[in-house]
From Swiss-Prot:
Organism for this UniProt entry: Serratia proteamaculans (strain 568)
Top enzyme category: hydrolase
Encoding gene (name): rnb
Main location: cytoplasm
Function of the molecule: Involved in mRNA degradation. Hydrolyzes single-stranded polyribonucleotides processively in the 3' to 5' direction.
UniProt-recorded name of the protein: Exoribonuclease 2
Cytoplasm as UniProt keyword: yes
Domain of life, per lineage: Bacteria
Keywords: Cytoplasm, Exonuclease, Hydrolase, Nuclease, RNA-binding
Length: 644
């Protein structure tokens, strides 16, 4: 009777259109219920029965209605699933497979089966890649996934590396060596093999891509020649090897090993500037004034060099700092080191006055055993020799930026525009509230930004610096010249690491076109998109492997009285994020560990402070001592508490 009733259909339609709806992202909890977060402002409760139809992170449309005097959201339509391709651990019961996604807020197993053609007998504990194929909001009875790739078994000590690389869909191995070109004979090369070029790297480095030579002009100025390995002599644009390098975009440096952008025969041998080996290079020569300024005699040219020494950062630093032990192999090399130190000092002084110099932060290096276990974590401070190489590389990248800008008007540029115009007022408010005069319009200029940074660098704490960081933009890769506020420079284009960065290979080809007076083509924007995306993925992979190794390393410290010095890097509503200064690990201090009475405490991300009874007890940038309360291996997270 009611089946085709138009009035009933109309009423249904009316009710549907009148039911309030919202769109948002599902946030799961460990207790079965969840929330629908709308625009980051408002959230609606999702009861456990409705949560069974969705997954944490799903973007959905939901209807709103009231139950027991509480407004709740009932997910109705899936807009964008949180999971599509993911990694997880396989469970096996009675030959039926399921997979638990490797994510801190996804605990439920998803039924799955291997795709056709995947011939692997999956066992419980195996790591695998899966693709979601069914979702309850799409009319399916439940969640379902296809297993598309076996990663490794549950007992593999190297799982942190293989799982992370699979998660981000990154290569596991160096590319195969394939046919390469002979160096282009039409590009004349100057013979610089008689000059005392040196390389300075870590002791374990095999892919040496920069060599340096300095000449004293006798009038207070110095002439610096930077010679850079020349992979584009062997890799033609558009060749199969070039396509491989373009896709990989960077050498991927992970704790314990790297996955090169180019075949190791090229990166570690044919192109590597090994001592006493004749190598083709792209070179830049520039005069550095007594005040550290770069003269306008910048010249790029192709050459051949023969490095006279493979020097090591720590040994060179020890010698320059007067620490007994290592000595330069000859007087000529000793003279080069001394002249390079002069270059470093005058350039560093110039950049302090006219640009910006990053504060020195240590690097943390994992020392690993054969099974991937962490034997120790070594803190490597940036020393004199590191600064020498850094100053020479920055100077040569400024030279490339100027030449590419003035001769072509394009290249691969690193661009950073300082404050986000939409957020600069927030920064002004924070600065003024802390006694620093600030003007939004001025802060958006390079000079104004540099002035503020110099002032903040002179402050006794990092509090203000970390507070205004949220209002700044991220560095970008661009084909058109633009300023780099972070370095305090009008333009910056890297070309000094072509073995490990595809963008530097592109700039090499453009610089060679200028040298040969040939027409050059502006790089496609797709190249910068690929570079930015790969840089993001490589950084995430490095962080993920690091988190896993930190969890392994700190596991046996949990529950002990061992104290660690830490710096507060973020304040959230739920507590503090801190970095352990002795090893670089990031840990979380939950609010209840700070003060037992929650109502007496305010953790404010807005002000970057923790207040107890109205008194500020912690600020972002503060140092404190902590102990490790717990290490959760399944989520690779470290929980700390303030030391008593």
């Amino acid at each position: 009777m009611f089946q085709d009733n138009p009035l009933l259909a109309q009423l249904k339609q009316q009710l549907h259109s009148q039911t309030p709806r919202v769109e948002g992202v599902v946030k799961g909890t460990e207790k079965g219920f969840g929330f629908l977060e709308v625009d980051g402002q408002k959230s609606y409760f999702i009861p456990p029965p409705y949560m069974k139809k969705v997954m944490h992170g799903d973007r959905v449309s939901a209807t709103l209605h009231t139950e027991k005097e509480r407004e709740i959201a009932e997910p109705e339509t899936l807009i964008e699933p949180f999971l599509s391709r993911f990694v997880g651990r396989v469970q096996k019961r009675d030959d039926r497979l399921s997979i638990v996604p490797d994510h801190p807020l996804l605990k439920d197993a998803i039924q799955c089966r291997p795709v056709r053609g995947l011939n692997h007998n999956f066992q419980a504990g195996d790591w695998a890649v899966a693709e979601m194929c069914r979702h309850p909001l799409k009319g399916d009875r439940g969640f379902n996934a296809d297993l598309t790739q076996f990663i490794t078994d549950g007992e593999d000590h190297l799982a942190p590396w293989w799982v992370t690389l699979a998660r981000h869909n990154l290569e596991k191995e160096a590319p195969e060596m394939i046919a390469i070109s002979e160096p282009d004979a039409s590009l004349p090369r100057e013979d610089l093999t008689a000059l005392n070029f040196v390389t300075i790297d870590s002791a374990s480095t095999e892919d040496m891509d920069d060599a340096l030579f300095v000449q004293d002009n006798g009038d207070g100025s110095l002439q610096l020649t930077i010679a850079i390995a020349d992979p584009t002599a062997y890799v033609e644009q558009g060749s199969p090897l070039d396509e491989i390098a373009r896709k990989r975009a960077f050498t991927n440096y992970l704790p314990g090993f790297n996955i090169p952008m180019l075949p190791r025969d090229l990166s570690d041998n044919l192109c590597s500037l090994r001592p006493n080996q004749r190598r083709p290079v792209l070179a830049c020569r520039v005069t550095i004034g007594a005040d550290g300024a770069l003269a306008d005699d910048i010249r790029f040219f192709a050459a051949e060099i023969e490095s006279k020494a493979k020097l090591v950062y720590d040994e060179v630093s020890d010698w320059l700092e007067g620490i007994a032990g290592w000595q330069p192999p000859s007087d000529d090399i000793a003279q080069q080191i001394t002249l390079l130190k002069r270059v470093c000092d005058v350039r560093n002084s110039w950049r302090h006055q006219h640009a910006l110099v990053f504060k020195d932060r240590p690097d943390y290096r994992f020392v690993l055993g054969e099974k991937g276990e962490v034997l120790e974590i070594v803190t490597e401070q940036r020393r004199t020799a590191n600064r020498i190489v850094e100053e020479c590389m920055i100077a040569s990248n400024v030279c490339a930026a100027i030449v590419l800008r003035d001769r072509l008007g394009f290249g691969i540029y690193n661009v950073h525009t300082g404050f986000d115009p939409l957020l600069v007022e927030q920064a002004v408010t924070v600065l003024q509230a802390n006694g620093v005069e600030a003007d939004a319009e001025k802060l958006l200029t390079l000079d104004g930004f540099c002035e503020l940074r110099r002032h903040l660098d002179s402050q006794p704490t990092q509090f203000l610096d970390s507070r205004i960081r949220r209002s700044q933009t991220y560095a970008e890769i661009s084909t058109t010249p633009g300023p780099h506020y972070g370095l305090g420079l009008e333009a910056y284009a890297t070309w000094t690491s072509p073995i490990r960065k595809y963008g530097d290979m592109v700039n090499h080809r453009l610089l060679k076109a200028i040298i040969a007076e040939q027409p050059a083509e502006k790089p496609q924007d797709e190249v910068t998109v690929q570079l930015a995306e790969r840089r993001r993925l490589n950084r995430m992979a490095e962080r993920d492997v690091g988190d896993w190794l930190y969890a392994r390393y700190l596991k046996d410290k949990a529950g002990t009285d061992e104290r660690f010095n830490a710096e507060i890097i973020d304040v959230t509503r739920g507590g503090l994020r801190v970095r352990l200064l002795d090893n670089g690990a990031v840990a979380f201090i939950p609010a209840p560990f700070i003060h037992a009475v929650r109502d007496e405490m305010v953790c404010s991300q807005e002000t970057g402070t923790v207040q107890i009874k109205g008194e500020v007890v912690y600020r972002q940038g503060d140092n404190l001592q902590v102990t490790i309360a717990e290490v959760r291996m399944e989520t690779r997270s470290v929980i700390a508490r303030p030391a008593a």
